[in-house]
């Protein structure tokens, strides 16, 4: 008998599911055919919107809801080639839409390969900073909301154990190099054998920030059959080296900086101003006061300068909302600051180069660089925070007189020619007296100023381009006075390990290196000397004093003994000895030693030096290292050709060995993970067994038929069981019974407490 279905309810049977599945396969086959037939030379002109691309309906729907309609130049060139599954190396200006250029191919690749939540990690996106990783993840969730993939974000500053428990169930993983490398090494369930796509965003920045070891570790965990997409705003030798290691026959897309009209957006107005070092804060204060209705991003070279400038300007209150952002901030604070500045209409953000890459802050009016960037590429990325996606923007670069000539030459190579801006003395206001007052009143502010001073000089000292950065020409005393300090602090510059490597080093490993054999942390503090220790170390001021010994003539040596107590004295020294008086040290002391020495000499003389020979196919013996005659060498060919043949032969051998070594290393890592997984499984089983073996002890009270045989009156509310009073307590249920004949009956007391209670009751009665 058929069941009556509610109106509007859909029924899916097996035939309907089969029809839908076949329909999806036909659509994917048509899209794949369009991708294979795509020719960049002829079809690129006809592609102007996302709807013209061979992508699925769900992706188009997500793009439309996120208001992404038109394609940029880099997206036109890269997305169709990336959809074919080929490796790609894309270079374009900042703010040109590189994020969508790799997110769309990632989503489409997983759809065509029919990746589900049970297939594990299929796409990995690596970003240099946490803020950029968060931004990529937000865009991914917007355009991929109609797909059924699981995506995760892993960055520093979060709970590692929480991420480890869930990272194995992710299909798409976005994160920073350090945290991704940690999960690949430690997460037991994280498998990369099914990885389809690897994306390296801002690859040059990943290498510049000291993440080379982490990137190499990530590449070592991934299969070689993957597709790799590498994107950056600038190309460098390190990026090319990384491309050779991780990409296979890559398509290099994007116009190089030599052929471009300019490496910066055309809608960006660029200016520079020549400012002495001791007037930088005055110029910055005057600039902020004259642009209170603007959104300003200010770059410094160190986090200490950001902290000092933020605290002092916040105290002076310029009339605009001030914010700060640098690497040592906690992750929650960094995200909160990023969101506030993005939503603010008029604000000023003091930051380091942590926000110079990839972050899309909407409607930034001015980008001010208080400190000179380390190179032209850093300048391009800094000013790229403004004038994004065709909007207008302005940038201002402060240069010292010693930096002006060298920096402008390096910018001119990249077709960047900022205009000189002159500052009127009337509009410039000095805040040096206010800063001196703050540092005098507040020791914390003075300490911040000293640390900012030292950080700036160190940042200039470590720069590689000595033609631009000349630390010996910096006016230390006048700069310290401009910060409000009474004098220039002493600077200790330590050599050795790179600051970037120190910053990215694991703090757990550093703490572990300071422990002793027992695992306890060693401290550099010496043992505390008490007054009793000093008393026992005190020298006698009478008999053993130096003055007393000099007067009496009894000198004491270092061992505390008097020199007069010696019974032997030296009569002469350094005199010539006769050869007849010297003993013959070569003669053996005993007959056994003499016989042994003679037999060893005889054996060595008869054997000679050992030689090792090798035999050819004809049985002729040859030495291991046999020199070739000049005639035979000439017959073999030209020396250069022989050298090239030898190098090529060794290169092929090294390639084969490299593949073998990588496979062995991968198997070792997999075996380590399997062992760790087995240990965790056994621990869970032992915990379950212990829980099952726990015995529940039930204590039974005295039987009470009246209470046990009570019938339920139908109420759902259970009445609380009243505690039965003891025999010595008062009440109606007291076990004491008063009879009419004047006698009182009590149970026999068993303990001392019962006896004392009985006595108290009798006295009371």
UniProtKB/Swiss-Prot annotation:
It catalyses: ATP + H2O = ADP + phosphate + H(+). Residues 267-439 form the Helicase C-terminal domain. Residues 79-253 form the Helicase ATP-binding domain. Interacts with the U3 and U14 snoRNAs. Associates with pre-ribosomal complexes. This is ATP-dependent RNA helicase DBP4. Its EC number is 3.6.4.13. Belongs to the DEAD box helicase family. DDX10/DBP4 subfamily. Residues 655-765 are annotated as: Disordered. GO terms for molecular function: ATP binding; ATP hydrolysis activity; identical protein binding; RNA binding; RNA helicase activity. A motif (Q motif) lies at residues 48-76. ATP binds at residues 92-99. GO terms for biological process: rRNA processing. Residues 744-756 have a biased composition (Acidic residues). Residues 655-668, 720-738 have a biased composition (Basic and acidic residues). PANTHER family: RNA HELICASE (PTHR24031). Keywords: ATP-binding, Helicase, Hydrolase, Nucleotide-binding, Nucleus, Ribosome biogenesis, RNA-binding, rRNA processing. GO terms for cellular component: nucleolus; nucleus; small-subunit processome. It is an enzyme of class 3 (hydrolase). Pfam families: CTE_SPB4, DEAD, Helicase_C. It is found in: Nucleus, Nucleolus.
């Amino acid at each position: 008998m058929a069941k009556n279905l509610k109106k509007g309810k859909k029924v899916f049977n097996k035939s309907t599911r089969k029809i839908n599945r076949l329909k999806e396969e036909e659509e994917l086959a048509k899209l794949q055919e369009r991708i294979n037939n795509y020719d960049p030379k002829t079809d690129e002109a006809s592609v102007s919107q996302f709807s013209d691309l061979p992508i699925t309906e769900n992706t188009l729907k997500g793009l439309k809801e996120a208001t992404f309609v038109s394609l940029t130049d880099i997206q036109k060139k890269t997305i169709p080639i990336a959809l074919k599954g080929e490796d790609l190396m894309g270079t374009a200006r900042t703010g040109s839409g590189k994020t969508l250029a790799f997110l769309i191919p990632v989503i489409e690749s997983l759809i065509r390969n029919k990746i589900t939540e049970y297939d594990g990690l299929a796409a990995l996106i690596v970003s240099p900073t946490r803020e950029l990783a968060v931004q990529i993840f937000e865009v991914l969730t917007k355009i991929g909301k109609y797909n059924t993939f699981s995506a995760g974000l892993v960055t520093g500053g979060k709970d590692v154990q929480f991420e480890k428990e869930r990272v194995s169930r992710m299909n798409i993983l976005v994160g920073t190099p350090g945290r991704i490398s940690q999960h690949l090494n430690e997460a037991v369930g994280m498998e990369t054998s099914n990885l389809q796509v690897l994306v390296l965003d801002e690859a040059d920045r990943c290498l510049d920030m000291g993440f080379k070891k982490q990137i190499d570790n990530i590449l070592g965990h991934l299969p070689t059959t993957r597709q790799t997409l590498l994107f950056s705003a600038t190309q460098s030798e390190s990026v090319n080296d990384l491309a050779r290691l991780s990409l296979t026959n890559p398509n290099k897309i994007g116009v190089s900086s030599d052929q471009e009209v300019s490496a910066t957006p055309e809608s960006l107005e660029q200016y520079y101003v020549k400012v002495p070092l001791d007037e930088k804060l005055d110029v910055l204060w005057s600039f902020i006061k004259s642009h209170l209705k603007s959104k300003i991003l200010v770059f410094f070279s160190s986090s200490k300068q950001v902290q000092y400038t933020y605290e002092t300007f916040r105290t002076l209150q310029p009339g605009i909302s001030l914010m700060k952002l640098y690497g040592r901030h906690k992750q929650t604070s960094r995200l909160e600051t990023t969101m506030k500045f993005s939503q603010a209409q008029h604000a000023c953000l003091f930051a380091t180069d942590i926000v110079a890459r990839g972050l899309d802050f909407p409607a930034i009016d001015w980008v001010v660089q208080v400190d000179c960037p380390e190179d032209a590429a850093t300048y391009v990325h800094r000013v790229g925070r403004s004038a994004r996606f065709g909007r207008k923007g302005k940038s201002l670069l402060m240069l010292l007189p010693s930096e002006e000539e060298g920096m402008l030459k390096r910018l001119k190579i990249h077709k960047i020619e900022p205009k000189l801006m002159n500052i009127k003395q009337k509009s410039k206001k000095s805040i040096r007296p206010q800063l001196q007052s703050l540092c005098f009143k507040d020791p914390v502010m003075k300490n911040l100023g000293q640390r900012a001073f030292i950080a700036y000089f160190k940042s200039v000292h470590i720069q590689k381009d000595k033609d631009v950065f000349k630390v010996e020409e910096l006016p230390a005393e006048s700069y310290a006075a401009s910060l409000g300090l009474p004098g220039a602090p002493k600077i200790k510059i330590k050599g050795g390990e790179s600051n970037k490597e120190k910053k990215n080093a694991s703090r757990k490993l550093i703490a572990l290196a300071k422990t002793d054999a027992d695992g306890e942390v060693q401290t550099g503090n010496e043992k505390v000397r008490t007054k009793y220790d000093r008393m026992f170390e005190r020298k006698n001021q009478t008999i053993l004093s130096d003055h007393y010994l000099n007067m009496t003539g009894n000198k004491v040596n270092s061992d505390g003994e008097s020199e007069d107590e010696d019974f032997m004295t030296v009569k002469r020294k350094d005199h010539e000895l006769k050869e007849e008086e010297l003993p013959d040290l070569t003669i053996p002391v005993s007959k056994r030693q003499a016989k042994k020495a003679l037999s060893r000499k005889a054996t060595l003389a008869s054997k000679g030096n050992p030689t090792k020979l090798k035999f050819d196919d004809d049985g002729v013996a040859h030495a291991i290292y046999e020199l070739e005659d000049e005639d035979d060498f000439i017959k073999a060919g030209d020396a250069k050709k022989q050298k090239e043949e030898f190098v090529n032969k060794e290169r092929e051998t090294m390639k084969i060995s490299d593949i073998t070594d990588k496979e062995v290393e991968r198997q070792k890592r997999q075996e380590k993970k399997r062992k760790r997984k087995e240990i965790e499984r056994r621990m869970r089983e032992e915990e379950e067994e212990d829980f099952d073996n726990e015995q529940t002890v039930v204590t039974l009270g005295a039987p009470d038929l009246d209470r046990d045989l009570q019938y339920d009156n139908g109420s759902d509310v259970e009445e609380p069981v009243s505690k039965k009073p003891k025999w010595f307590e008062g009440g109606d249920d007291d076990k004491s019974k008063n009879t009419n004949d004047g006698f009182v009956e009590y149970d026999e007391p068993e303990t001392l407490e019962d006896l004392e209670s009985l006595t108290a009751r009798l006295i009371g009665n």
